[in-house]
């Protein structure tokens, strides 16, 4: 028997590291060694790939990739609909890190918060979305898929040939996800485009509007979601902006968390966190508006009386508030038929599909990641039937839900359309998974230039000996000050963990607790007009009618302990938590910017 060779501790450590990497199936490059949380592991050599195995043309990063262990028992691939973005080069990441350390933050004017859709998407340019190429029933499935792959590669080539990577925003490079959109549009009678009211221009691609209303001849309903996170005057201003530029739109205001009008909703107010109990989903604002829009579109071709009766039952149940537990609520409500679509259902059906077949209207829900598509379906159903998460890309395949026997909802995975938006704004819009960001500091700087983060969070400059003295801030200083305030330290050297602090600040922004709201063009000059508009007062009253009046709702002062922060950083599903959270304003600080301070009620020793 050969003699055993010595095996050092260093070799054993290396062996365990390699084993962990193989087990996790890390397809992406690891974080840069300069990250405070990534330790000494070097990032792997960048891999290039495309969504369907065609010739390698661009650097692709697959987000939230799971270990490759083959197909599941039902042939399900968990990585099939993962987000695929163009990878940032190492040079670009390092350049942005240097800028975060060197560039002094300068507050921007209110006019700089105004976004015009013409500047974001440039309608008529190559910033389109991929269309399904022509096909016939004589083609085999393999021929059709090969044709779609070639067409998709040509689509990517046109975009990357017209714009540089630095100018382009993140957008979806996964053909499988675009196929989901094609199928949803083909099977839908009415299309809902869900947007976030804080930045609806970001989530509204004009190319999709032209395709749905023009080529397909379908009705498009624009849902301005999360209206509780923006001042009512701004909501009304955005509604009129889209009506003016896109007259064929049907616009609906929606939120799953309507606010109590007894508390102020002005920007700059302090937030408390409240937990929705019992029939929380039945308090959604907007189902009645959506029903009226669908009635105007179908003009009597579909019997929607059962939907109206359901809304009346939900409103009555929410007003009584006689159910205290979520389990009782789910047992008490009628069953919802859920159909998970398979590959056979993804086969093309042709543009000549019969509308309102068998007296059923199919409503397709499309939009960007993290705009609240799944929450909207939960709000329409009246209870939780769809898993929701703060992490974009959570919906991995589309399912259909029968709201009533004559109304079918279809949930599509989120899609990012190509645009010219700054990538920092996309991160703040929740489009890019925060846990996967290689360089979060410039996004924090983008936020701090538009809302007074340092004042709202009572941050002290890291180099300031005198708290009353003025010091120039850079993005790195903001992150370091927040790490010092929260006690975020690295494991070995106990330095301020600026990477974790930056992620924490970005999560506060995405969750709406540091709310950055963009404005339509001309809003700054006409702000007083919109605040006194009749629809603004009507919106405030409508939120009051569905607000917390007698239902079980608990409010707790937000202290954001380290343990609570860790739960947020793990991106747990709302299903696992068993209850939803919303932020409730409690006082107005008079700030002119749409930012809320959840820490103003805390003393120095409590932070």
Swiss-Prot record:
Name of the encoding gene: Gnl1
Ranges where the record places region Disordered: 1-81, 544-607
Domain characteristics, as noted in the entry: In contrast to other GTP-binding proteins, this family is characterized by a circular permutation of the GTPase motifs described by a G4-G1-G3 pattern.
Compositional bias ranges of the Basic and acidic residues kind: 15-26
Family named by the database record: Belongs to the TRAFAC class YlqF/YawG GTPase family.
CDD domains: HSR1_MMR1 (cd01857)
Protein name, per record: Guanine nucleotide-binding protein-like 1
Species annotation: Rattus norvegicus (Rat)
Presence of keyword GTP-binding: yes
């Amino acid at each position: 028997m050969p003699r055993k060779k010595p095996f050092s501790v260093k070799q054993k450590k290396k062996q365990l590291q390699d084993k962990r990497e193989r087990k996790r199936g890390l397809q992406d490059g690891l974080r840069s060694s300069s990250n405070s949380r990534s330790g000494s592991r070097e990032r792997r050599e960048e891999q290039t790939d495309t969504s369907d195995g065609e010739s390698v043309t661009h650097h692709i990063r697959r987000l939230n990739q799971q270990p490759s262990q083959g197909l599941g028992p039902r042939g399900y691939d968990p990585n099939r609909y993962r987000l695929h973005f163009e990878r940032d080069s190492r040079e670009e990441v390092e350049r942005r890190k240097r800028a975060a350390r060197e560039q002094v933050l300068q507050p921007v004017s209110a006019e700089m918060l105004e976004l015009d859709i013409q500047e974001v998407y440039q309608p008529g340019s190559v910033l389109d979305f991929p269309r399904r190429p022509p096909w016939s029933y004589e083609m085999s499935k393999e021929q059709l898929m090969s044709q779609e792959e070639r067409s998709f590669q040509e689509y990517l080539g046109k975009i990357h040939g017209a714009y540089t990577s630095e100018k382009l925003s993140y957008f979806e490079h996964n053909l499988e996800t675009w196929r989901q959109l094609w199928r949803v549009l083909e099977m839908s009678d009415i299309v809902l485009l869900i947007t976030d009211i804080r930045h609806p221009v970001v989530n509204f691609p004009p190319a999709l509007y032209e395709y749905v209303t023009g080529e397909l001849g379908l009705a498009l309903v624009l849902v301005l979601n999360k209206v509780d996170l923006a001042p009512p005057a701004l909501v009304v201003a955005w509604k009129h902006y889209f009506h003016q530029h896109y007259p064929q739109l049907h616009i609906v205001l929606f939120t799953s968390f309507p606010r109590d009008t007894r508390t102020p909703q002005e920007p700059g107010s302090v937030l408390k966190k409240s937990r929705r109990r019992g029939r929380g989903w039945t308090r959604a604002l907007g189902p009645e508006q959506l029903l009226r829009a669908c009635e105007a579109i179908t003009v009597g071709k579909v019997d929607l009386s059962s939907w109206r009766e359901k809304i009346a039952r939900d409103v009555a149940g929410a007003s009584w508030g006689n159910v205290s537990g979520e389990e009782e609520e789910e047992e008490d409500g009628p069953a919802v038929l859920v159909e998970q679509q398979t590959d056979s259902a993804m086969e093309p059906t042709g543009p000549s599909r019969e509308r309102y077949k068998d007296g059923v209207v199919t409503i397709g829900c499309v939009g960007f990641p993290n705009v609240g598509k799944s929450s909207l379906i939960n709000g329409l159903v009246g209870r939780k039937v769809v898993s929701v998460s703060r992490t974009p890309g959570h919906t991995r395949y589309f399912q259909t839900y029968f709201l009533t026997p004559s109304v079918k909802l279809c949930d599509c995975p989120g899609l990012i359309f190509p645009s010219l938006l700054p990538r920092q704004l996309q991160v703040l819009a929740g489009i890019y998974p925060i846990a996967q960001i290689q360089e979060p500091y410039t996004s924090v700087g983008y936020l701090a230039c538009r809302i007074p983060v340092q004042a709202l969070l009572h941050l002290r400059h890291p180099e300031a000996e005198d708290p009353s003295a003025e010091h120039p801030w850079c993005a790195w200083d903001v992150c370091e000050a927040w790490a010092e305030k929260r006690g975020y330290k690295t494991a070995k050297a106990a330095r301020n963990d600026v990477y974790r602090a930056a992620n924490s600040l970005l999560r506060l922004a995405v969750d709406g607790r540091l709310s950055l709201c963009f404005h339509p063009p001309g809003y700054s000059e006409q702000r007083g007009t919109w605040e006194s508009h009749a629809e603004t007062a009507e919106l405030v009253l409508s939120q009051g009618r569905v607000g917390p009046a007698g239902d079980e709702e608990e409010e707790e002062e937000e202290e954001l302990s380290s343990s609570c922060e860790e739960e947020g950083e793990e991106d747990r599903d709302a299903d696992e938590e068993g209850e939803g959270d919303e932020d409730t304003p409690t006082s107005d600080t008079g700030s002119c910017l749409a930012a809320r301070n959840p820490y103003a009620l805390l003393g120095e020793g409590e932070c």
